[in-house]
Amino acid sequence: MVLYFTGTSNSRYLARRIAEGLEMPLYDLNACIKAGDTAPVQTGQDVVLVTPTYAWRIPRVVSEWMSKTALTGAERIWFVMDCGSEIGNAAGYNRQLAAQKQLQYMGTAQIIMPENYIAMFNAPRNEQARSIVEQAEPALQKVLTRLKAGQQFPAPRENLYDRFMSGPVNPVFYRFFVKADAFRTTEACIGCGKCVEMCPLNNIHLENGKPVWGKNCTHCMACICYCPKEAIEYGKKSKGKPRYHFEALERKQDV
């Protein structure tokens, strides 16, 4: 089974491609996490977990869900992580998670996809994003080849920098940066509730037709990037930046 969590659908796209290539079922962790569903999942022997990279590891909400949820029938697990640039030493923590779940760790693969973390970085415009997705195809094909053969992924890079970013920096990043406090709406907001719908942690509700953010945010960027009116800002850091979600690339090419 292919499990995935996603913010702006990079991971959903990769998971769908992998599931199609392996003829495996696809399992949406966003829906489970949003519903608070930790019931056992019948996965079969092989599990592929596809996630974005948050602070140089898999998202904390995913590792927490995995810790609470029995993967019935699972014996082996592969991790596929998409990122804007690097995953650090995420593989070391994925190995620990596999051991915790008593699963054979089959490796971690990194695939570069378009950046969406506009709370800190710049997202590409659609034309550039399409190019990045095209450039990701060889890496995706290598992942599929290994998975079809039941082989381990090659060990990723691991150096002092990687261990530092995934190690001490990760909890510091969550503590000081992963907060919803800076989210706000502009006058363009129409109160459609798309942000409420997309938030995997139920951290947004409408008051007087306007979104209000709570304290339980994972910085997935779904709210700000899916807003149809681009009426959400993250303080001053997102002003003027392109919004990115994968579905926009599947529409008619930009004129």
Name each model-derived stretch.
Residues 1-2, 6-14, 20-32, 37, ...:
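FMN-binding flavodoxin-like domain, especially the glycine-rich phosphate-binding loop
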